């Protein structure tokens, strides 16, 4: 009888391996609320920036082609921020454990995408800021006052979105370095 018990325990499943980097990465989203707040700010600022710029693009009837670039970058940044916000909230609600959470590959991808979004936003906002002044949309005769104020608001919100993305990029880079050093 004792021999049959030893045989049955001999084939039991081995205990699940402990992966410190996965456990650490899963704890980021529920122990560090700053990343969730930054994701909310990214989404809100990029949504306002691209919607105001899209309205401005509609009003100038596409005569300034590079405004389309700014709208496209704003849409991509807003979609990325919404996806990251959804995942962050999912981790917070679920209470991500060691078996279900983020992986180091996800952390690398997040860092790279945060960096790309940051640089695309700053390039689009700065190109639009100089283009608005050079193209004469904000004319000195006062004819483009409404267009000028909307373009200034859009560029301002794009710069605010840039700041939120850059702060998030710094945080994800910090967490990535800590993860690499722990592993």
Swiss-Prot record:
What InterPro entries does the annotation carry? CASP_dom
Q: Which residues cross the membrane?
A: 34-54, 73-93, 119-139, 157-177
Q: Which residues are glycosylated?
A: 141
Q: Does the keyword Transmembrane helix apply?
A: yes
- Enumerate the Cytoplasmic topological stretches: 1-33, 94-118, 178-183
Pfam families given in the database record: CASP_dom
What's its membrane topology? Multi-pass membrane protein
Compartments annotated for it: namely: Cell membrane
Cellular component per GO, a single term: plasma membrane
Which residue stretches are annotated as topological domain Extracellular? 55-72, 140-156
Question: What keywords would UniProt list here?
Answer: Cell membrane, Glycoprotein, Membrane, Transmembrane, Transmembrane helix
Q: Which residues form a coiled coil?
A: none
Under the subunit heading, UniProt states:
Homodimer and heterodimers.
Protein family per UniProt: Belongs to the Casparian strip membrane proteins (CASP) family.
Query: What protein name is recorded for this chain?
Result: CASP-like protein UU1
Name the source organism.
Selaginella moellendorffii (Spikemoss)
């Amino acid at each position: 009888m004792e021999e049959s018990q030893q045989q049955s325990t001999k084939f039991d499943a081995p205990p699940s391996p402990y992966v410190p980097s996965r456990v650490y990465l899963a704890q980021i989203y529920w122990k560090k609320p700053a990343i969730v707040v930054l994701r909310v700010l990214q989404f809100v600022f990029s949504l306002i920036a691209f919607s105001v710029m899209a309205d401005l693009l509609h009003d100038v009837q596409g005569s300034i082609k590079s405004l389309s670039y700014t709208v496209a970058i704003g849409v991509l940044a807003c979609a990325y921020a919404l996806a990251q916000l959804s995942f962050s909230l999912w981790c917070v609600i679920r209470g991500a454990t060691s078996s279900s959470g983020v992986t180091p590959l996800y952390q690398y991808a997040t860092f790279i995408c945060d960096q790309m979004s940051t640089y695309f936003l700053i390039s689009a906002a700065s190109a639009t800021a100089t283009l608005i002044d050079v193209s004469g949309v904000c004319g000195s005769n006062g004819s483009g006052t409404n267009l000028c104020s909307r373009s200034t608001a859009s560029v301002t919100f794009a710069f605010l979105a840039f700041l939120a993305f850059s702060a998030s990029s710094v945080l994800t880079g910090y967490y990535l370095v800590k993860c690499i050093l722990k592993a």
